């Protein structure tokens, strides 16, 4: 999550459930329902909390949304920096890229006005690879995947995108400064099984 300490009391935001607190009325920014990241987050909540509690959480959180839903993470970070909202759900690496100046000086200044908060445990999105059943170069494909799973390959894959490396290797300093966290133990299979229900609950709650 990304927050503006001048708009919200960050000591009161520890978890995703806290975004449903009435004190955040008009201060929450979210991407639209089509975002697979948010669909997975809701599926994660269903697995951990159950359908009933997730439905109640969604209803209260959506009532706190400050304005129409955003098309992407960067626009949310900008809105938080401009105090149009106080907290938003985003992927950390968008903030990291902005801080690094990848998007230009203006976005770097916006990002510096915000702070990244990571719940413990945190919902984690992953990058994955596989080998097609009828691939003609299976041996080479397997070697490539094995390289990406190595410390060197993991670091090389994560560095330009500011993601967390798969292996225990040195992280980008910007990402490292966001702090340590515990990944949620929910599996990809679990998220896939609950995805359709997650979308339904999001729609029912008014998450457009």
What are these regions (language model features)?
Residues 1-7, 43, 125-138, 156-157:
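A bilobed periplasmic-binding-protein/Venus flytrap-type ligand-binding module shared by bacterial periplasmic
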Residues 52, 163-208:
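An extracytoplasmic/periplasmic, membrane-proximal ligand-sensing/linker region
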Residues 26-34, 58-63, 67-70, 108-133, 147-171:
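Periplasmic-binding protein-like
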Residues 1-84, 98:
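Extracytoplasmic ligand-binding site segments that recognize negatively charged/polar headgroups
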Residues 24-28, 83-86, 111-113, 138-141:
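Loop/turn elements at helix/coil->beta-strand transitions in domains of secreted/extracellular proteins
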Residues 86-110:
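A ligand-binding cleft/hinge motif common to bilobed small-molecule-binding domains
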Residues 50-63, 106-109, 180-181, 190:
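Short, solvent-exposed loop/beta-turn-alpha elements that line the ligand-binding surface or hinge
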């Amino acid at each position: 999550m990304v927050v503006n300490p001048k708009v919200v009391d960050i000591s009161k935001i520890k978890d995703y459930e806290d975004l449903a607190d009435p004190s955040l009325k008009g201060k929450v920014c979210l991407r639209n329902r089509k975002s697979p990241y948010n669909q997975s987050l809701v599926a994660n909540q269903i697995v951990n909390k159950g359908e009933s509690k997730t439905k109640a959480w969604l209803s209260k959180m959506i009532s706190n949304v400050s304005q129409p839903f955003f098309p992407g993470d960067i626009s949310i970070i900008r809105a938080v920096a401009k105090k149009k909202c106080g907290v938003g759900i985003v992927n950390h690496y968008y903030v990291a890229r902005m801080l690094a100046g990848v998007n230009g000086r203006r976005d770097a200044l916006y990002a510096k006005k915000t702070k990244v908060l990571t719940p413990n445990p945190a919902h984690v999105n992953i990058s994955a690879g596989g080998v097609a059943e009828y691939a003609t170069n299976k041996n080479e494909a397997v070697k490539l995947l094995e390289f990406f799973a190595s410390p060197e390959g993991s670091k090389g894959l994560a560095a330009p995108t500011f993601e967390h490396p798969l292996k225990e290797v040195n992280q980008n300093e910007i990402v490292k400064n966001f702090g340590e966290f515990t990944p949620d133990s929910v599996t990809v299979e679990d998220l896939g099984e609950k995805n359709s229900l997650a979308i339904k609950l999001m729609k029912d709650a008014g998450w457009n």
